UniProtKB/Swiss-Prot annotation:
Protein name listed in UniProt: NADH-quinone oxidoreductase subunit B
Keywords tagged on the record: 4Fe-4S, Cell inner membrane, Cell membrane, Iron, Iron-sulfur, Membrane, Metal-binding, NAD, Quinone, Translocase, Transport
InterPro entries assigned to the protein according to its UniProt record, in alphabetical order: NADH_UbQ_OxRdtase-like_20kDa (IPR006137), NADH_UQ_OxRdtase_20Kd_su (IPR006138)
GO biological process: aerobic respiration; electron transport coupled proton transport
Catalytic activities: a quinone + NADH + 5 H(+)(in) = a quinol + NAD(+) + 4 H(+)(out)
Gene from which this protein is expressed: nuoB
Length: 189
């Protein structure tokens, strides 16, 4: 009686789709790199403090883009800073995700109309997966956004584009309130 004849009746054998195992590993060990530029950075730092304990979600902040798989852009992005944001994004390994935190990084904030030096949303230079609104958003909102990124990762499949994963997430009935997801093809002006 060989291994194939015995089957998989033993309790110590794990049989699961490769997608599920890879996605579980990715969403259980999210390594964000914070790119704090203004007031939202204070709330992002508060979220990383002991009161909210992001490590219980498997989220370990990193300072290097080469070690992170999530970029959190928090605050006002000026035209000069946009080049650095793109450079840091390109240094991140695949798969990479972007969370835009606060009104300034989402749409330019209070500077959008009269500020010639302010980028009118970070999604004009890099693709954004999850938006967290607020000025500045509370740490609870950021945690909710991080959990939304984890839901996006859970829905991905090998060979599936990010657009398809967003559509699949919407089909499951998970409402993104107060978070807004956008398709990656519409990002980047």
């Amino acid at each position: 009686m060989g291994l194939l004849d015995a089957g998989f009746s033993r309790d110590n054998v794990l049989v699961a789709p490769v997608d599920a195992v890879l996605n579980w590993a990715r969403l259980s060990s999210l390594w964000p790199m914070g790119f704090g530029l203004a007031c939202c950075a204070i709330e992002m730092m508060a979220t990383n403090a002991s009161n909210y304990d992001l490590e219980r979600f498997g989220i370990f902040p990193r300072s290097s883009p080469r070690q992170s798989d999530l970029m959190i852009v928090a605050g006002t992005v000026s035209m000069k800073m946009a080049e650095r944001v793109v450079r840091l994004y390109e240094q991140m390994p695949e798969p990479r995700y972007v969370l835009s935190m606060g009104s300034c990084s989402n749409c330019g904030g209070p500077y959008w109309e009269h500020g010639y030096h302010v980028l009118k949303g970070v999604d004009r230079v890099i693709p954004v997966d999850v938006y967290v609104p607020g000025c500045p958003p509370r740490p609870e909102a950021l945690i909710g956004g991080l959990m939304k990124v984890q839901e996006l990762i859970r829905m991905e499949q090998i060979g599936m584009s990010r657009q398809e994963a967003l559509k699949k997430l919407a089909e499951t009935g998970v409402e993104p309130r107060p978070f807004i997801e956008r398709e990656r093809s519409s990002a980047g002006a």
